[in-house]
From Swiss-Prot:
Gene: amzA
Active site per database record: 132 (proton acceptor)
EC number annotated for this UniProt entry: 3.4.-.-
Disulphides: none
Sorted UniProt keywords: Hydrolase, Metal-binding, Metalloprotease, Protease, Zinc
Binding residues annotated for Zn(2+) 1, in chain numbering: 131, 135, 141
Cofactor note: Binds 2 Zn(2+) ions per subunit. One is catalytic, whereas the other seems to have a structural role.
Stated name of the protein: Archaemetzincin
Length: 183
């Protein structure tokens, strides 16, 4: 029996409690999750935009894809940095094929000059990681209220959604998992 395998790769220091919550949430969908904390992968300086003081998410992900050697259904990179794509002021995450990167900087309360809140930060990170995993597994944005696959244009949008897939999105993942088990 083959489970869908997810690899989480940290590119910067991420608190262990956050990693544990990510694993717990994804495992609840029957996904096998591995963690690579000391990946020797990094954010390429060539992808840093010095005028914006942000990483170009497409350049970062293209670079990481080019040097990967992992055999997983979904590979998620985490960076406690700020990212953007052309046409947007920022992105929380970006997915290309089965690779995704999540930028954590704007998920922190401190970014908005508010008091640090590790619990809220953890919830936001889990939601955005789950969202990007959904994209790597073929899900698109969902309009079902509260679904983790809702598009988030702001941290308030992240706060409105839950850390779980709606029934329809969960069913799609279950169907994919059953298909992979038959291979």
């Amino acid at each position: 029996m083959t489970e869908m395998k997810i690899l989480i790769v940290t590119l910067t220091y991420i608190e262990k409690s956050i990693i544990d919550e990510i694993v717990n949430n994804l495992s609840s969908y029957g996904l096998e999750v591995d963690i690579l904390l000391d990946s020797r992968k990094y954010l390429p300086i060539s992808a840093f935009n010095w005028e914006r003081l942000q990483y170009d998410a497409e350049k970062v992900l293209s670079f990481l894809k080019s040097i990967h050697d992992f055999n997983y259904d979904s590979i998620i990179f985490l960076a406690d940095s700020d990212g953007y794509i052309d046409g947007y002021n920022f992105v929380f995450g970006l997915t290309i094929d089965n690779f995704a990167i999540i930028f954590l900087h704007r998920l922190r309360e401190e970014f908005y000059n508010r008091k640090p809140d590790l619990d809220l930060f953890m919830k936001r990170v889990v939601k955005e990681v789950t969202h990007e995993v959904g994209h790597t597994l073929g899900l698109s944005h969902c309009n079902t209220t509260g679904c983790v696959m809702n598009f988030s244009n702001s941290v308030e949008d992240v706060d409105k959604k839950q850390a779980k897939f709606c029934k329809n999105c969960a069913h799609k993942i279950e169907k994919l998992s059953k298909y992979l088990q038959q291979k």
